[in-house]
Amino acid sequence: MAEYKNFKVETDADGIALVTWDMPGRSMNVFTEEVMDELDRIVDQVAGDAAIKGAVITSGKDTFSGGADLTMLQRMLGLFAEEKAKDEDKAIRLLFDNVGRMTGLFRKLETSGKPWVSAINGTCMGGAFELSLACHGRVAADSDKVKMALPEVKVGIFPGAGGTQRVPRLADTQSALQMLTSGQNLSPKKAKAMNLIHEIAEPKKLVETAKAMIRNGLKPVQPWDEKGFKLPGGPVYSA
């Protein structure tokens, strides 16, 4: 079994891998280059092991994740500035690849051929919620501590890892637009009403509820990858 610094992967007799995100030395999990490297390897591990039926990803901390590490974004922009002085076209390509890395990783997960379920035990923001949306199943703990959001708009940026594509394919258009343009926090009850999560579970039964989704035959295919998929709110028309 591979070893990871930021994740613990355990596969029980049920054939379901439990991926626990628990970054050492941090009070909250965040996406860094290293975290993305490791998650990429875990997706390969789950997909390539015939003994693994699917995976549940959760957090080993009181919160799920705050999203992307802002210092990582600063490094991207710093590297862009350095490369731009040497070769502007190369710098643009590099920035595009770096910015799109998380999007590609989440798409890889949702098309890996194995079902993934996100077990959201606490605050789940930005890129972390986009990761959850890429999972085939989503379960949130029934707790006031659980808040889900795409809050990037509050700091002048827009969700860049698939949230703007997946939310409108799950929720009706009006609710999706309100969420994406306001950065509002969603409680488990509100998120379920918007069809952004599938189940709400007692905190102590969160992981078991997530595993049950896989045992009960959760398909490793997103609704929008099914033939004949239609937006939940119907076609969007303009005047």
Can you describe what each PLM-predicted range is?
Residues 103-155, 179:
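Glycine-rich beta-to-alpha active-site loop
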Residues 1-58, 82:
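Conserved CoA-thioester-binding segment of acyl-CoA-metabolizing enzymes
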Residues 59-104, 154-156:
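Glycine- (often His-adjacent) and acidic-residue-rich active-site loop
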Residues 71-80, 130, 135-142, 170:
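A glycine- and small-aliphatic-rich helix-loop capping segment at beta-alpha/alpha-beta transitions
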Residues 4, 16-18, 33-36, 42-43, ...:
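Intrinsically disordered, low-complexity segments enriched in small/flexible residues
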